[in-house]
């Protein structure tokens, strides 16, 4: 066992010795070892998607649920022929349905790519720029706040206390003369 390499009882070679409680590569605790092998890892990138309910968080409930009745309506007394009304309904519904599918087929993946890149950049900037800047600012402002606190307690507190004592002795009496 030279050169900092260690071999365990099963013949595995390690660069670090196995301690009594084990290490991250080979725990001595059998329960812990079994738990590590039995854990199921769930990855957010490989989760199953629901092809039936595609808006589980109801993001677009009030925005894009536009039906024929929401757009075109004939008031009482001004009705077109029933056949025209049915054909208009069918034309509107089918056109909206298939044109949405066509646009989704043409632009869905590129838009998903663009929005994925955008939110990746946004997340990156938030994690690596915004939060550290805010933390840095809070650390730096602590020094200024201590100096400001000393200034207020040294100069402003006595001044305003004296002004308060001056004005506390003023009495106002109001009388109504008839």
Swiss-Prot record:
Subcellular localization, as worded in the UniProt entry: Golgi apparatus membrane; Cell membrane; Membrane, Caveola; Membrane raft
N-acetylserine modifications at: 2
Chain positions with N6-acetyllysine modification: 5
Residue numbers spanned by region Required for homooligomerization: 2-94
CC per GO annotation: caveola; endosome; focal adhesion; Golgi membrane; membrane raft; perinuclear region of cytoplasm; sarcolemma
Disulfide bonds: none
Region (Interaction with CAVIN3) location: 82-94
GO molecular-function terms, A-Z: molecular adaptor activity; oxysterol binding; protein kinase binding; transmembrane transporter binding
Segments for region (Interacts with SPRY1, SPRY2, and SPRY4): 149-160
Residues in the bilayer without spanning it: 105-125
Cytoplasmic topological domain residue ranges: 2-104, 126-178
InterPro entries, A to Z: Caveolin, Caveolin_CS
PANTHER family for the chain: CAVEOLIN, CAVEOLIN-1
Functional summary from the UniProt entry: May act as a scaffolding protein within caveolar membranes. Forms a stable heterooligomeric complex with CAV2 that targets to lipid rafts and drives caveolae formation. Mediates the recruitment of CAVIN proteins (CAVIN1/2/3/4) to the caveolae. Interacts directly with G-protein alpha subunits and can functionally regulate their activity. Involved in the costimulatory signal essential for T-cell receptor (TCR)-mediated T-cell activation. Its binding to DPP4 induces T-cell proliferation and NF-kappa-B activation in a T-cell receptor/CD3-dependent manner.
Entry's family note: Belongs to the caveolin family.
Quaternary structure, from the entry: Homooligomer. Interacts with GLIPR2. Interacts with NOSTRIN. Interacts with SNAP25 and STX1A. Interacts (via the N-terminus) with DPP4; the interaction is direct. Interacts with CTNNB1, CDH1 and JUP. Interacts with PACSIN2; this interaction induces membrane tubulation. Interacts with SLC7A9. Interacts with BMX and BTK. Interacts with TGFBR1. Interacts with CAVIN3 (via leucine-zipper domain) in a cholesterol-sensitive manner. Interacts with CAVIN1. Interacts with EHD2 in a cholesterol-dependent manner.
Protein's name according to its UniProt entry: Caveolin-1
Organism per entry: Loxodonta africana
Taxonomy of the source species: Eukaryota, Metazoa, Chordata, Craniata, Vertebrata
């Amino acid at each position: 066992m030279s050169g900092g390499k260690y071999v365990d009882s099963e013949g595995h070679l390690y660069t670090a010795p196995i301690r009594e409680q084990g290490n991250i590569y080979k725990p001595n605790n059998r329960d812990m070892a079994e738990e590590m092998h039995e854990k199921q890892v769930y990855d957010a990138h490989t989760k199953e998607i629901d092809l039936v309910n595609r808006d589980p968080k109801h993001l677009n409930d009030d925005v894009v649920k536009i039906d024929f009745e929401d757009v075109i309506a004939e008031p009482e007394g001004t009705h077109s022929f029933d056949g025209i009304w049915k054909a208009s309904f069918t034309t509107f519904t089918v056109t909206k349905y298939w044109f949405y599918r066509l646009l989704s087929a043409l632009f869905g993946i590129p838009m998903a790519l663009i929005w994925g890149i955008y939110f990746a950049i946004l997340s990156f900037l938030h994690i690596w720029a915004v939060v550290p800047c805010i933390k840095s600012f809070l650390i730096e402002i602590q020094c200024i706040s201590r100096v400001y606190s000393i200034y207020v307690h040294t100069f402003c507190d006595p001044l305003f206390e004296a002004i308060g004592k001056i004005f506390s002795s003023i009495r106002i009496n109001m009388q109504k003369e008839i």
